[in-house]
């Protein structure tokens, strides 16, 4: 049986009211930020990264790694939090928030990173927010 997810749907105007122009461009218009320009690329504190649009938890900090690509990289998302779909160009796989359908970035496979999944979920920093761990809450 599939997980039940409460979907967040908003009009373009409602999204514009709660997101910055750059967040809107990336989450709602499937944009990409300039590599190395945002806060979470070299950020390695313990906690949870959530969707900036709907606050859904997406990634544990323990799955983040330094891929040297200029964007935050994770080797997996939280179960049921991320959707994957082929890009129209057929070359990449887009990742979106399972709750609000916000564009997060792309997944790349088989690049040889020594991670459990051999995947790099390349995420735009402005599409996520960091929530620090409480003592003994991250495993």
Swiss-Prot record:
<keyword id="KW-0676">Redox-active center</keyword>
<dbReference type="Pfam" id="PF01641">
    <property type="entry name" value="SelR"/>
</dbReference>
<dbReference type="GO" id="GO:0030091">
    <property type="term" value="P:protein repair"/>
</dbReference>
<dbReference type="InterPro" id="IPR002579">
    <property type="entry name" value="Met_Sox_Rdtase_MsrB_dom"/>
</dbReference>
<keyword id="KW-0479">Metal-binding</keyword>
<keyword id="KW-0560">Oxidoreductase</keyword>
<keyword id="KW-0963">Cytoplasm</keyword>
<protein>
    <recommendedName>
        <fullName>Peptide methionine sulfoxide reductase B4</fullName>
        <ecNumber>1.8.4.12</ecNumber>
    </recommendedName>
</protein>
<dbReference type="GO" id="GO:0006979">
    <property type="term" value="P:response to oxidative stress"/>
</dbReference>
<dbReference type="GO" id="GO:0046872">
    <property type="term" value="F:metal ion binding"/>
</dbReference>
<feature type="binding site">
    <location>
        <position position="51"/>
    </location>
    <ligand>
        <name>Zn(2+)</name>
    </ligand>
</feature>
<comment type="similarity">
    <text>Belongs to the MsrB Met sulfoxide reductase family.</text>
</comment>
<feature type="binding site">
    <location>
        <position position="54"/>
    </location>
    <ligand>
        <name>Zn(2+)</name>
    </ligand>
</feature>
<feature type="domain" description="MsrB">
    <location>
        <begin position="12"/>
        <end position="133"/>
    </location>
</feature>
<keyword id="KW-0007">Acetylation</keyword>
<feature type="active site" description="Nucleophile">
    <location>
        <position position="122"/>
    </location>
</feature>
<dbReference type="GO" id="GO:0005829">
    <property type="term" value="C:cytosol"/>
</dbReference>
<keyword id="KW-0862">Zinc</keyword>
<dbReference type="InterPro" id="IPR028427">
    <property type="entry name" value="Met_Sox_Rdtase_MsrB"/>
</dbReference>
<comment type="function">
    <text>Catalyzes the reduction of methionine sulfoxide (MetSO) to methionine in proteins. Plays a protective role against oxidative stress by restoring activity to proteins that have been inactivated by methionine oxidation. MSRB family specifically reduces the MetSO R-enantiomer.</text>
</comment>
<feature type="binding site">
    <location>
        <position position="100"/>
    </location>
    <ligand>
        <name>Zn(2+)</name>
    </ligand>
</feature>
<feature type="disulfide bond" description="Redox-active">
    <location>
        <begin position="69"/>
        <end position="122"/>
    </location>
</feature>
<dbReference type="GO" id="GO:0033743">
    <property type="term" value="F:peptide-methionine (R)-S-oxide reductase activity"/>
</dbReference>
<feature type="modified residue" description="N-acetylalanine">
    <location>
        <position position="2"/>
    </location>
</feature>
<feature type="binding site">
    <location>
        <position position="97"/>
    </location>
    <ligand>
        <name>Zn(2+)</name>
    </ligand>
</feature>
<keyword id="KW-1015">Disulfide bond</keyword>
<keyword id="KW-0249">Electron transport</keyword>
<dbReference type="InterPro" id="IPR011057">
    <property type="entry name" value="Mss4-like_sf"/>
</dbReference>
<keyword id="KW-0813">Transport</keyword>
